Amino acid sequence: MDAVAAEPVVAPVLPLPAQVRDLGMQDYAPVWRAMQRFTDTRDEHTGDELWVVEHTPVFTLGQAGKPEHVLAPGEIPVLQVDRGGQVTYHGPGQLVVYPLLDLRRLKIGVRDYVCKIEQALIDTLDEWNIVAERRDGAPGVYVGGAKIAALGIRVRRGCTFHGLSFNVAMDLEPFHRINPCGYQDLQVTSVLDLGGPSGMDAVKAVLLDQLARQFGLVLQPTSALPDLSLPA
C-alpha cells in the first residue's frame, strides 16, 4: 500500500487576551509618561492592554507638529509629545483609547494597524447609522468632510502606544484655536452632533467591541490603574 502523506496540522489562531483599564478623567502628561514606561519595560511575555481615558483640556503637538498651527490656545496648555502627527485637542466628552499592542504577536504591520483602528471607528459609527470614511494620506475618520476621530501613534520595538481620540459629546470650540492635524479650516464634528448618543459608556462599549474584533482580542476589564506618578 502506498503511504499517504499526512496533512500538516495548522494550529488555530486563538483570540489573544488584552486587559482593559478605564482610567476615567486624567491629565494628559501622567498618562503619557505611564504608557511610555509600560512600552519601555515590556517584553515578549508582557500582555497587551487597552487604556481608556478622557483627558482634561490640552493641546498636543506630535513630532511633525508646527507651532504655527496652534493659533490661540488661551488658557489651554500645549504639550509637545512623541506621537506621530500634528496638533490636536483633547478634552472632556472625547473618548481616548491607547492600544498598547505587540504588533509582532498580532502579525500585522503599522499600515494594517492604522487601517484596523479606522475600521473599528467606522463600524462603531455604523451602529448609529452614521456613515463614516477614511481618507488617503490623512489618518483618521471623517463624516461628510468633518473629522470625528484622530489618530496619533508611536511604535517602539514593534509595540504601539498613543492611539485614537473620538469626539463623542464634547465642546468643539477649542478646535477653532488650532489647525486640527495641521489642516487650515478643517471642520470637526461629534457623535452627538450627528444624532448619536451622548453617553460615553454606550459608545465606549461598542468601540471596544469593534477594536477587539479587528485585532482578534479577548478583552479582560480590570479595575487596577497604571502608576500615573510623574518622575521627580
Swiss-Prot record:
Its main location: cytoplasm. Residues 44-219 form the BPL/LPL catalytic domain. The record marks K147 as: Lowers pKa of active site Cys. GO terms for biological process: protein modification process. One of its GO terms (cellular component) is cytoplasm. It comes from the Bacteria. Pathway: Protein modification; protein lipoylation via endogenous pathway; protein N(6)-(lipoyl)lysine from octanoyl-[acyl-carrier-protein]: step 1/2. The active site is at C181 (acyl-thioester intermediate). Coiled coil: none annotated. It catalyses: octanoyl-[ACP] + L-lysyl-[protein] = N(6)-octanoyl-L-lysyl-[protein] + holo-[ACP] + H(+). Its EC number is 2.3.1.181. Transmembrane segments: none annotated. It holds the Pfam family LplA-B_cat. GO terms for molecular function: lipoyl(octanoyl) transferase activity. InterPro entries: aa-tRNA-synth_II/BPL/LPL, BPL_LPL_catalytic, Octanoyltransferase, Octanoyltransferase_CS. Catalyzes the transfer of endogenously produced octanoic acid from octanoyl-acyl-carrier-protein onto the lipoyl domains of lipoate-dependent enzymes. Lipoyl-ACP can also act as a substrate although octanoyl-ACP is likely to be the physiological substrate. This is Octanoyltransferase. The lineage of its organism: Bacteria, Pseudomonadati, Pseudomonadota, Gammaproteobacteria, Lysobacterales.
